[in-house]
């Protein structure tokens, strides 16, 4: 039997394997938490009138209707250092995909050699025999068991997971920029309110001094009024420091040096308000939108594909090879006898020791189970975070409404106290108490507004919007 016949018979035996690909085909497991209909329902904590069931817009920060904020987010998404690092990670993952694809392509090798035989003694070098060889070798992996295809599938899924991680950075950056800008505006509003209360207290202090000078007041009253002024004034440096910290954070997020912080933001008089009910969507939309969920799902797909990569190790690896070359002395290099060529399959098979391959398959299956557990955990965390953020936002809005009413009542009481004191109906301690209550109400309301901004940012961060504001991968869970 000729070598050609043996090779042909071997190919005929192994060609049916081309219809099979090792390992399981990936699909979202039926027992995954994300596949449960209960995970797709409307949010339990999203029934307040301040929320709507509309799909959140991707550029959710535009709901505030502030062009300056929109410009800051755009700049940050273009220049943020964390995003630049995430983009580099994505390029590296894409290069890995190209590497895996190249493994299934034709490989070419060229070799050349020359020899010079030299006999010992007094033999002249010019008389030494010389020979040369030049060869071209081509090889193409047939990938009958599908190991290379599964490797490409795993590399693609890993690259998509890295893209999702990049998208998560975009979400975090957009939320951080919005939070920092709104904090600057909130601090400015609090500063204005504090200075307004301080102006009232200083006017009271001056009036008290005049009364004491005219014999209608005491030094004790002057001291108490001065203490109230100093107590309110002491809060201003802290507010200024907090505002500056937010401005510097904003600069860093935008990729600027501290000296180049956006000074125009210092003039924001108060935080912009949402112009409509906050759209939150439902659970199904959330899981489709959140990049961390997508990254976990793509990691599960990659782990599933790796089972096929390891399963392919149970089967022979067939490479179709072809070689052509020329060899001989310089005088005979162009003769017919110096040429040679061959073509045929090359078989590589780790057999009979299959226990190692089966152990690797078992390990790959365990990795897939780990990836599924991680995916389920991230889905549960996404739903929990969103429900928690919705509840916290609802309660903080209610708290702010109550504190706003309390501030109005305190301002009215402070004005009435001054009038009553002027007519001798109450003593000076009551005036100071009313003004202290107003200062406390202003402080509590400012704190609540800052908390409400933080709660809204946590909610938007939980909803996962903002990653599609630039080029990105498809966000759908497979």
Regions found by a protein language model. Name each.
Residues 2-78, 132, 156, 240-288, ...:
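Terminal intrinsically disordered/low-complexity segments used for targeting and assembly
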Residues 7-10, 211-217, 235, 256:
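Amphipathic alpha-helical interface segments used for oligomerization, scaffolding
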Residues 22-25, 59, 65-68, 72-75, ...:
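Small/polar-residue-enriched beta-strand and adjacent coil segments characteristic
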Residues 78-81, 384:
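Surface-exposed, polar/charged faces of alpha-helical domains
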Residues 79-80, 214, 423:
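Charged, alpha-helical scaffolding/interaction elements associated with membrane systems
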Residues 85-100, 169, 173-210, 227-232, ...:
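Amphipathic alpha-helical coiled-coil segments
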Residues 107-109, 219, 249, 260, ...:
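Residues at or immediately flanking beta-strands
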Residues 213-242, 444:
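Repeat-solenoid scaffold signature
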